[in-house]
C-alpha cells in the first residue's frame, strides 16, 4: 500500500482520486425559515446524477429556524443516509456555511441556497472538468427562474451570458477579469483543500457575503474552469426577502458600500492594474443604478443620510480613484444618474427617474434637459441611443419637474 504520511492534504486527495477515479462531493445548505421551499430544493440536490462522484454528503445547517423547516430536515435526514442535519442558534448565513464547511469531508465542495433548485445534472460537467484539468474550482452559468401567471420564465443576465459563452479551461483571473462579476458561491464546485488552505471566509452578518469571499477565491486560484452549462436555478420570488429587494434600507446601502470597499482593497492588494481597471469600469458599477433609484424613492429610510452615503461612495470609488463613473461601461442613462449624484443634484435625479418610469426605458427616447450644461461630459448630452432605438419622430423633449 502507498505510504501517504509525507503528503500534504492536497497530495493525499489527488492520490485518492487517482486510486478510485471519482471524488466525493460535499454540499453545504444553510437553512433559515424556508419551510415552503426547502424540500423541493433538497430533492433537486438528492436527484442529481452521481456518475462522476463516488460519494455524496449533504450537510444541512439549520440556523435556528422557527417555521417548521427543522421538522422537514429531520424527516429528510431519516429518509436519506447522505443527509446530515446540524442545528445551531440563529447566527446568519455566513456562520451557517462555515459550520457546514467545517463538517465537510468530501474531496469537492459546493453550496446550495435552500430556496433555489438545481437543474438536471448540475455537477457532472464541472466535476469532470476538474478531474481533467486539476484546476482549483469550476464555475457554470446560472439562470434566474420566475413564475408569472403560472408560466415559468427563465433568463440570464447579459454578463453571465457573456462570461459563459465559451468553455475556458485552466483560466487565471488576470486572463478572464470579467469573472470578478461572478460573485455567487452556488454555481461553482471547489476542491475542498483549495478552500481550506486559502482560508476563504464569508463575512459575517451582511447581505452581500458572497462578493468578498468570491473575490478572495478568484485571486487565490492557480486556475479555474469556466463551463457553458447552466448549473443553477436562481429562483426569483415575489415574496422573497432578498437583498436585491431591499435597496432602500439604509443598512443595506451601508453593507453594499462596505462590500465594494473590501473588494477594491482585495484587488488592489492582490491583482494587477488591469484587473483593478476592469473592477471599477465593468464590475462594481453594475448594480449601482438600483441605489440611485432608491436614493430618491419616497419610502427610502433616512433619505438625507442615504444620499450622503451614496454620494460619498460614488466619489470615493470612482471619481477619487481617477475613473469617473461616466467612463464606465454601464448604459448611459445609469452613468447620467451617477453624474447627477456626484453633482449633488437629488431633485434632478428624481426627475430623470420619474421620466423613465413614466415612459419606460424601452419605449421612450429621452433627450434630457441638462445637455447644455457645460460640466456635463459630452457623451451624456444625448442618451437616447443607449435607452432604445426607435423610429424617426419618437424623440421626447422633457423639462425637469419644479418643486
Model-derived segments and spans:
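Nucleotide-sugar donor-binding/catalytic module of glycosyltransferases
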Residues: 1-256, 262, 384, 389-391, ...
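C-terminal subregions of glycosyltransferases and related glycan-biosynthesis enzymes
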Residues: 1-19, 236-403
Amino acid at each position: 500500500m502507498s505510504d501517504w504520511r509525507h503528503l500534504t492534504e492536497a497530495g493525499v486527495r489527488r492520490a485518492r482520486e487517482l486510486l478510485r477515479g471519482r471524488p466525493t462531493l460535499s454540499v453545504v445548505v444553510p437553512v433559515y425559515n424556508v419551510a415552503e421551499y426547502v424540500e423541493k430544493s433538497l430533492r433537486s440536490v438528492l436527484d442529481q446524477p452521481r456518475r462522476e462522484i463516488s460519494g455524496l454528503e449533504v450537510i444541512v445547517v439549520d440556523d435556528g429556524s422557527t417555521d417548521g423547516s427543522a421538522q422537514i430536515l429531520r424527516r429528510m435526514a431519516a429518509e436519506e443516509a447522505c443527509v446530515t442535519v446540524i442545528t445551531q442558534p440563529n447566527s446568519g448565513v455566513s456562520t451557517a456555511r462555515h459550520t457546514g464547511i467545517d463538517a465537510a469531508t468530501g474531496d469537492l465542495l459546493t453550496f446550495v441556497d435552500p430556496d433555489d433548485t438545481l437543474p438536471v445534472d448540475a455537477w457532472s460537467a464541472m466535476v469532470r472538468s476538474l478531474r481533467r484539468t486539476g484546476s482549483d474550482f469550476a464555475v457554470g452559468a446560472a439562470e434566474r427562474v420566475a413564475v408569472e401567471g403560472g408560466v415559468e420564465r427563465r433568463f440570464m443576465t447579459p454578463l453571465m451570458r457573456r462570461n459563459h459563452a465559451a468553455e475556458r479551461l485552466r483560466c487565471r483571473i488576470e486572463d478572464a477579469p470579467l469573472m470578478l462579476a461572478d460573485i455567487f458561491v452556488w454555481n461553482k464546485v471547489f476542491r475542498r483543500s483549495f478552500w481550506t488552505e486559502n482560508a476563504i471566509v464569508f463575512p459575517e452578518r451582511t447581505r452581500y457575503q458572497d462578493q468578498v469571499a468570491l473575490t478572495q477565491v478568484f485571486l487565490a486560484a492557480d486556475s479555474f474552469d469556466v463551463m457553458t452549462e447552466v448549473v443553477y436555478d436562481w429562483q426569483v420570488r415575489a415574496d422573497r426577502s432578498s437583498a436585491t429587494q431591499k435597496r432602500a434600507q439604509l443598512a443595506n446601502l451601508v453593507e453594499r458600500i462596505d462590500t465594494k470597499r473590501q473588494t477594491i482593497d482585495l484587488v488592489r492588494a492582490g491583482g494587477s492594474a488591469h484587473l483593478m481597471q476592469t473592477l471599477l469600469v465593468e464590475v462594481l458599477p453594475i448594480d449601482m443604478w438600483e441605489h440611485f433609484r432608491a436614493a430618491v424613492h419616497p419610502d427610502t429610510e433616512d433619505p438625507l443620510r442615504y444620499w450622503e452615503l451614496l454620494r460619498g461612495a460614488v466619489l470615493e470609488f470612482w471619481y477619487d480613484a481617477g475613473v469617473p463613473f461616466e467612463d464606465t461601461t454601464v448604459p448611459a442613462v445609469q452613468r447620467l444618474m451617477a453624474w447627477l449624484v456626484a453633482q449633488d443634484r437629488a431633485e434632478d435625479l428624481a426627475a430623470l427617474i420619474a421620466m423613465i418610469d413614466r415612459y419606460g426605458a424601452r419605449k421612450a427616447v429621452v433627450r434630457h434637459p441638462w445637455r447644455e450644461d457645460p460640466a456635463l461630459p459630452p457623451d451624456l448630452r444625448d442618451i437616447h441611443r443607449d435607452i432604445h432605438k426607435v423610429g424617426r419622430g419618437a424623440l421626447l423633449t422633457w423639462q425637469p419637474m419644479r418643486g
